[in-house]
Amino acid sequence: MPCTTILVGKNASYDGSTLVARNEDSSNGVFEPKRMRVVHPDEQPRVYTSVLSHLTIELPDNPMRYTSVPDVVPGHGIWAEAGFNELNVGMSATETLTTNERVRGADPLVDYVPAKGNEGEDGYVPAQPGGLGEEDMVTLVLPYAKSARDGVRILGELLERYGTYENNGIAFSDVDEIWWLETIGGHHWIAKRVPDDAYVTMPNQLGIDSFDLDDAEGAQADHMCSADLRDWMAEWHLDLTLGVEGDGPAAVFNPREAFGSHSDSDHVYNTPRAWYMQRCLNPSDVWDGPEADYTPESDDIPWSRVPERKVTIEDIKYVLSSHYQGTEYDCYGSKGTPATRGAYRPIGINRNSQLAVLQLRPYAQPAYRAVQWMAFGSNSFNALVPLYANVETMPEYYADTQARVTSENFYWANRLIGALADVRFHECGRAVEDYQEKVGGMGHKQIHDADAAVATLPEAEVPAELARANEAFAERVRVETDALLGKVLYTTSCAMKNSFAMNDNIR
């Protein structure tokens, strides 16, 4: 999916949490309805078959309960996207990445090949299943991962065995670490630990810009990779590091140069998003003019960097909702020209499906440590709401999305608000900002109060109390969301082209 990701190490976050956040964006012209779900062990398949690639995999018989954000409309797979399991391991998958022709030739993607002819007749060729994809990964890994590293290991083994039909980035987190895995070609992969004092920005582009092969093949303190990566790179001359003697890759090399892309479309679709996110979190750098450290089209924007101050939930929401505010590239702005205002792909876009922020709080007990913040629809007009993950069920307001358009659930209410507010952006702006700030404040207080309420409970009683807290807060969110929908509907209705100032009737 065309998504945007930000990862925040525990020493760079406002409260010591590891933070993993990703927009799931539908393809252009598609608006995929989403919902929240808790998947129980008896609901997890023991034999899994992918809808898109027709790949069948036997799964272990000991899955854990986990949260997910699946598609609503059936027919093209689960697309579970993001969640936590019972051990407070988080996973967000996937960020679609780019690659290059050399990698595609060295390790082709594993595409599904339909059968040819009719079975039993001469010339019949059976279908060949494809590899793994975004449709599958959370379902295949999250129920079994015991730590962030373990999630990397499990997915890495699956990739080496079955391959993949697309290039993807995947985040794994626990209370101590965040790991970012990038697939390389059909069967290869690398993974890097996010520095504790740094954040990572990821548009739809292979991002890791420094990788230590010796560490990946040895202690694996900060790097992991597919078993034959060094030999494969040497065979196909993939390392582009200058001055390296011999045929093999450098011990420390730049994967973005070796495996990634620097295309014209990257400079319109991808690099501007990394530029703006880092502009927000490191504002003292020079971002504009001829002396700029980085421009929207720079190919060397760092994968990770230390922020100027600690990063909050609100910072994450802002950058993942952004449309280049304060620059000539803002599609709603007045700076620049019509050409500059439409030059680059916004992060907060009309086809945001959902945003999941996975927070693991070290100061909270394991029974209520994991909080999954959720937003649906276009991020420029929605609000994040917190949900405790250690629960048996999700509130109906978040879980009961249907294909039918209605204002009775959080997904469709936010879709309606976004479509109405977009056309009267400035007139609706104050109401939207007030809603976002109020719901955000309510969310922080909700978590603080619920933490206190469960702190002295026996562990076995905590999930039920957390579920009640989630449900009560969802009802408060419903009230605020309905009120905002009414406000933007009124504002946009008043501005309809067929309005007329003379009254026929006054009540």
For every predicted segment, state its role:
Residues 231-368:
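Glycine-rich, aromatic-lined ligand/substrate-binding cores of catalytic
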Residues 436-507:
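Histidine-centered catalytic/metal-binding microenvironments
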Residues 21-35, 96, 181-183, 319-330, ...:
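Soluble extracytoplasmic regions of secretory-pathway and membrane proteins
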Residues 60-66, 152, 334-342:
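Short Pro/Gly-enriched beta-strand edge/turn motifs at strand-loop
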Residues 138-144:
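Short, well-ordered beta-strand elements within core beta-sheets of diverse protein domains
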Residues 324-325, 329-456:
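Substrate-recognition/cap regions that form aromatic- and gly/pro-loop-enriched pockets
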Residues 144-150:
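Short, charged, surface-exposed loops that flank catalytic or proteolytic processing sites
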Residues 2-134, 154-293:
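A contiguous strand-loop segment
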